[in-house]
Amino acid sequence: VAMASLTVAAQAQNISLRVSVSEGRSGVNFAPIHAEVGDFALTPSLPGHAPGQQWRVVARDAAGTVLHEVAVKNTQQRHIEVFNPKTGAIDMSRQVKQADGVFEVSLPFNADIASVDVLAPASTNVGIKAVTAPLAKFDRASLEKKVGASKMMRTQSMAAAAPAATVTTVVNTGPSNARMDYVFIGDGYTAAEMGKWQADAKKVIDGFMADPLFAANRANMNVRRVDIASNQSGVDEIDKGIYRDTAMDGEFYCYNIERLLCVNETKVYNIVGSVLSPDQRDVIVVISNSTRYGGSGGAIATASMNTSSVEVALHEIGHTAFALADEYEGGTCGISSEPTEGNVSINRTRSVKWGSKIAAATPVPTTVGSVANGTVGVFQGGRYCSNGIYRPTENSRMRTLGYPWHAVNEGLVKTVFGKYTAVTQTGTLSSGGIAYAPNTSPGYIQAGNGTFNVQLTGPAGADFDLSLYKSLSTGWSKVAVSRGNTSSESINYVGTAGYYYIEVKSYSGSGSYTVKYSVPPK
């Protein structure tokens, strides 16, 4: 098991980066276009079942050792899907490559962080030096310069006569660093139409929160509405020769697809980022001022005010926020290896990845119509393949709009929400003392597969160490450690299901500490 040895500054500090992506003659170019530092949450790594190739963003020390690593979406890959407005079934599915894109990521930025690299999908484990050249490298000096420039731009914007955007909190269940925060922003609404936008936003948000999946996880969510006026009302409809001057350049018929609604993602991030911190914008949904049917997924979800807009957006958020696979046929099919998504598989037996949810009386493989819809089984067809790929239920929202999510998808969503539900424990250590988390009975945590995030903040001048232990057949074993010359440490560990506990140890010095941790749900 790889173990990380981290040295970090006394004061916990993270950096949020907005990185532009563009295609150049010599390959893909990455450039930081915005940066800010603060005590906000780290970006959760994409689930192991996330579809498509991913970029890895790593923070290194001066020796080149990886201190932190996170998987982010490859924004150059875009899967396009168009649903039938009458039946909810898929009409068209296609993969396209975007020349330009943008993504945001939050990483530790302690004193020992010397650089941030972007790597190809095959990457190094935490604590081991990379053996492949990075796609991009940003040294600390350039990042600190970008932080200063971004702060100056934001200060100048706040000093303007009237802010371009305003924000309203609709649902507030707790601190943003321990919640999945949803942002709904309107495009193509003029200043005179702000009342209409606010009414439209209420319809969409109420529709989201009425969905059983979101209603069940309401306690783990915050929802905000961002208002910004466009110069003109409506949306570009390129196929009809209609063009509008809007805040985020919303347009139908992008990629020559009638029902595809796209926006300028850089403008979206800039506008939302001007009024919300990194913790407050986990999932962004742009609502265009049009009743034309359409929408899209990707890093940012889009929808119109068509009566079916909520259904389209819910499916797309299944991709954007929860990394769920499509469960329909049609498109580019591949069955050479096990899909990484948690709701599709090439395994047609009871040992399939969701096998624990299959009742003994349910036949496997499972024939369509043989059991009630929603019954978990092994149904042929999914992830664009009519044969060789299997899905857990006959019909779910990831196959046809208007259907429930069902148990397997609900469980995968619960895992993602669990990454935002951090536990905070405080205490006091004397020199040489040891404390454990959790400090309540039974003294350990039962966790599932996924990423474990632990952050320790202690008193200045002290040296505290942080360790993560797992129960193995041979006893408790230390699987990750953060050990430096200060009292602030962090662990980002990808582990398997089992029992865990955290140890905080004073190497020297005494005082109060805070340990914050989140683990994948069992």
Locate predicted features.
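Short amphipathic, basic-aromatic surface patches that mediate peripheral association
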Residues: 14-49, 451-458
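Beta-sandwich interaction modules
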Residues: 87-112, 122-127, 131-134, 485-495
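Edge beta-strands of jelly-roll/beta-sandwich modules across compartments, strongly enriched
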Residues: 408, 505-522
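Active-site recognition of the HExxH zinc-binding catalytic motif
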Residues: 311-327
